[in-house]
Regions:
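Substrate-binding pocket helix/loop in short-chain dehydrogenase/reductase
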Residues: 143-144, 148-156, 238, 249
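Short C-terminal tail/terminal secondary-structure segment
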Residues: 38, 44-45, 192, 269, ...
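C-terminal helical subdomain
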Residues: 227, 251-275, 279, 286-288
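Residue(s) in the substrate-gating loop at a strand-loop-helix junction
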Residues: 187
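Canonical Rossmann dinucleotide-binding motif of NAD(H)/NADP(H)-dependent dehydrogenases/reductases
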Residues: 48-78
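Active-site helix of classical SDR
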Residues: 167, 203, 211
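Alpha-helical segment proximal to the catalytic Tyr-Lys
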Residues: 172, 216-220, 277
């Protein structure tokens, strides 16, 4: 058991020298100022999207919905695009019930005509899109020798070409206003590859290339272009995996768990915020350590 000692004059002087004990009001004021500063910084990061128009594709469920909720929490006005009209309407109704300003746009990103019509409707409604999140994506997995050309084309069309066409359709107002945030959802597979997913990996690697190239084109106009590369995330896409497949996947994750849509959404919100205004052409990995490359 430790014995307590009465404080000596020497220890009192030491505490005074280090600001301990002798000046409680100064310490309290300092802590209060620190707490206030931290709160202000948190508010700046969390709420600096006030009034910004944000479009999230694939926004009806999963990662897309989580992104929409995070951006709304930071003050953004939402435009949600999805091909699933019924699910999209349900999601927007639920968001509105929470007091979130959200508008639904039915868009099929595999169709150039649908993208053009959707972009036109969005611009007519809001005049501009300041934050674009290219989230819509699908998988059609198979081994190379068994993969059908139609499955290759569909995955590339939705995951890559759709993002290209929509970004192209909405870029002009960003250039004119000299401000914009473009964030595309890539994948750890686009960074490291994966057997049985040559189409998906190619589409996501292509999205990373698009991100870095476009970042160089538009940086001088105040527009940042980045990507988030999720790993093993709890989504409808991964829900179909068997218990054995899930265990095998988790064995490759140093953090030992699946990520959540919110993990990805918070990364997107950061890249859309002023806190990330000096970051462009970057791929932010959200994968629990599955991939640690450059």
């Amino acid at each position: 058991m430790l014995a307590l000692r009465e404080p000596t004059q020497e220890s009192s002087l030491k505490r005074q020298a280090y600001g301990q004990g002798s000046c409680p009001s100064i310490m309290s004021d300092g802590k209060a100022r620190l707490a206030t500063t931290s709160a202000q910084r948190s508010t700046e990061i969390m709420g600096d999207l006030e009034g910004r128009i944000a479009l999230v594709t694939g926004g009806a469920q999963g990662i897309g919905r989580a992104i929409a909720e995070e951006l709304a929490a930071a003050g953004a006005t939402l435009a949600l695009a999805d091909v699933n009209e019924a699910k999209l309407a349900e999601t927007v109704a639920e968001l509105k019930a929470q007091g979130i300003d959200a508008t639904a746009f039915t868009v099929n990103v595999s169709s150039e005509e649908s993208i053009e019509a959707g972009a036109k409707a969005i611009l007519e409604k809001f005049g501009k899109v300041e934050i674009l999140v290219n989230n819509a994506g699908i998988t059609r997995d198979n081994l190379m020798l068994r993969m059908k050309r139609a499955d290759w084309d569909l995955v590339l069309n939705i995951n890559l070409t759709g993002a290209f066409l929509l970004t192209q359709a909405l870029l002009s107002p960003m250039l004119k206003n000299r401000w914009g945030r473009i964030v595309s959802i890539a994948s750890v597979v686009g960074r490291a590859g994966q057997a049985g997913q040559v189409n998906y990996a190619a589409s996501k690697a292509g999205l990373i290339g698009l991100t870095r190239s476009l970042a160089r084109e538009v940086a001088s106009r105040g527009i940042t272009v980045n990507a988030v590369a999720p790993g093993f995330i709890e989504t409808p896409m991964t829900a179909v995996l068997s218990e054995e497949q899930t265990k095998a996947m988790l064995a490759t994750v140093p953090l030992g768990r699946r990520g959540t849509p919110k993990d990805v959404a918070q990364a997107v919100k950061f890249l859309a915020s002023d806190a990330a205004s000096y970051i462009t052409g970057h791929v932010l990995d959200v994968n629990g350590g599955m991939f640690m490359g450059g």
